[in-house]
Amino acid sequence: MTRIALGIQYDGAAFSGWQSQPHGNTVQDALESALRQFAGVALPTTVAGRTDAGVHALGQVVHLDTDLVREPFSWVRGTNAFLPPTVAVRWAQEMPEDFHARFSAHRRTYYYALTFGPTRAPLLEDKAGYVMLPPGQSLDVAAMNEAAQVLVGEHDFSSFRAAECQAKSPVKTMYSIEVRGEGEWVFVRIRGSAFLHHMVRNIMGCLVAIGRGRQPVSWMGDVLAARSRVAAAPTFMPDGLYLAEVGYPDAFSLPASPASSSLFRGVFDEHAGL
């Protein structure tokens, strides 16, 4: 039995999230259907991180176990032949038995892309979040970035946890959060050990409230300390959320995430010290 890791990229707008559902309209259903057509047998997959409906992925990782013998690129080419245009396998690699797409991961990076202004941009539908602001007004990016820093470190993130979250513990470690502005765009990069259900979107809801001046910078600390979902802002839209990268120990030698050459990475690399 051989363990294969696959790097997956997808546009989540048309899907009901990652996890398989009876109606079949999920990314996992699309991927496993394509694998079955290519390999001729069912090949269940294990994912690094389940994404919600409407959330995109630049660097999702899954693993599967198989008796089939194929060259790595054969998995890429063969599976992609049966996938819809909104999902693609970017790479494939044979892995040791102790590799696990979820439990071997030690870091996950999310990006959120947000626009603001008096009118929405139709060409960005489903690809970026949007905040309607009157002409001449903007989000206070500096306040958003300052407020976000209280979340860095190991904390109980119950205030940012969905009611239906199945995680055993609300305690997670946040490695870094950066908020950057570019014209009518705001980009947020969040790195952590792991994330609770809706955690990033709930953090975004609070950041937007602060950016609009509806809450002070200090409010983020109050929300965190409350350890109650009702203390935080409403869950923000999924449209601009991207699972950018899943980090593993160097010993596994997995390919670099395509996010490394993306617009998002470029925005943050322009700022010294990031």
From Swiss-Prot:
Which residues take part in binding substrate?
Answer: 110
**UniProt record, GO biological process:** tRNA pseudouridine synthesis
Its recorded name reads tRNA pseudouridine synthase A
Q: Which top class of enzyme applies to this chain?
A: isomerase
The record's subunit annotation is: Homodimer.
Q: InterPro entries annotated for this entry? A: PsdUridine_synth_cat_dom_sf, PsdUridine_synth_TruA, PsdUridine_synth_TruA_a/b_dom, PsdUridine_synth_TruA_C, TruA/RsuA/RluB/E/F_N
Pfam families the UniProt entry points to: PseudoU_synth_1 (PF01416)
- PANTHER family attached here? PSEUDOURIDYLATE SYNTHASE, TRNA PSEUDOURIDINE SYNTHASE-LIKE 1
Identify the keywords attached in UniProt to this record, alphabetized.
Answer: Isomerase, tRNA processing
Purpose of the protein: Formation of pseudouridine at positions 38, 39 and 40 in the anticodon stem and loop of transfer RNAs.
What EC identifiers does the entry list?
Answer: 5.4.99.12
Which residues are named in the active-site annotation? Answer: 52 (nucleophile)
Task: Report the HAMAP family cross-referenced here.
Answer: TruA
Family affiliation: Belongs to the tRNA pseudouridine synthase TruA family.
Catalytic function, reaction form:
uridine(38/39/40) in tRNA = pseudouridine(38/39/40) in tRNA
